Swiss-Prot record:
PANTHER family named among the record's database cross-references: NF-KAPPA-B INHIBITOR ALPHA (PTHR46680:SF1)
Gene expressing this chain: G3
UniProt KW Transcription keyword: no
Presence of keyword Isomerase: no
Keyword terms of this UniProt record: ANK repeat, Host-virus interaction, Inhibition of host NF-kappa-B by virus, Repeat
Name the record gives this protein: I-Kappa-B like protein G1
Superkingdom per UniProt: Viruses
Residue spans of the ANK repeats: 56-88, 93-123, 127-156
Gene Ontology BP annotations: cellular response to tumor necrosis factor; symbiont-mediated suppression of host NF-kappaB cascade; toll-like receptor 4 signaling pathway
One MF annotation (Gene Ontology) recorded for this entry: NF-kappaB binding
Protein family (similarity comment): Belongs to the polydnaviridae I-Kappa-B-like protein family.
């Protein structure tokens, strides 16, 4: 009964548990869909959860996209239904979900995002790159085709000198 009481009031989900954020961020990162669905009433009572950043400048949608590739679409779809911003940017590089999908080679997420009304298909991050630029630099023909076929902005990036500092920056394994 005590466990159900904690779940109902949501305190366990909104308190910081470590430097990586709170339990809600953990569920977005590594939890299963049932945990996220069960948490929906707590989220609806605490909508600010959807917009809080973790220690690396990521919101819940960015965390799901980057760390739970196999469940990213389902998690993000639920989070957006609950009120998350599908076009939000993480704070480190200004990447959107589409940038993250290109960087993690999450073809399913990229295709879903491209077909979702309201998604900024030509969003430019802080390094002046679109999702297509990331796929182009990684020579990921499959991702480039998904973006091209689904109407994303697909201009070939200007070749940048390899010694340029910005070309070697990375974000948790997502070199952009």
């Amino acid at each position: 009964m005590a466990e159900n009481e904690h779940f109902r009031n949501g305190i366990d989900y909104v308190e910081l548990v470590n430097q990586e954020g709170h339990t809600f961020h953990y569920i977005c990162r590594a939890g299963n869909m049932n945990e996220l669905v069960d948490m929906a009433p707590v989220i609806l009572r605490n909508l600010d959860l959807l917009f809080q950043y973790d220690h690396e400048g990521r919101q819940c949608t960015h965390i799901a996209a980057e760390y739970d590739v196999s469940n990213a679409v389902m998690k993000i779809e639920l989070l957006v239904m609950l009120g998350a911003d599908i076009n939000s940017r993480e704070l480190k590089f200004g990447n959107t979900l589409l940038h993250i999908a290109a960087g993690t080679e999450n073809y399913q997420l990229a295709e879903w995002l491209c077909k979702k009304p309201g998604v900024e298909l030509g969003a430019i991050n802080f390094l002046y790159k679109t999702a297509y630029h990331i796929a182009y630099e990684r020579q990921n023909a499959r991702m480039m085709e998904i973006l091209r076929v689904n109407g994303a902005v697909c201009d070939d990036p200007i070749d940048i000198d390899e010694s340029d500092e910005t070309s070697s920056e990375s974000n948790e394994g997502i070199s952009i």
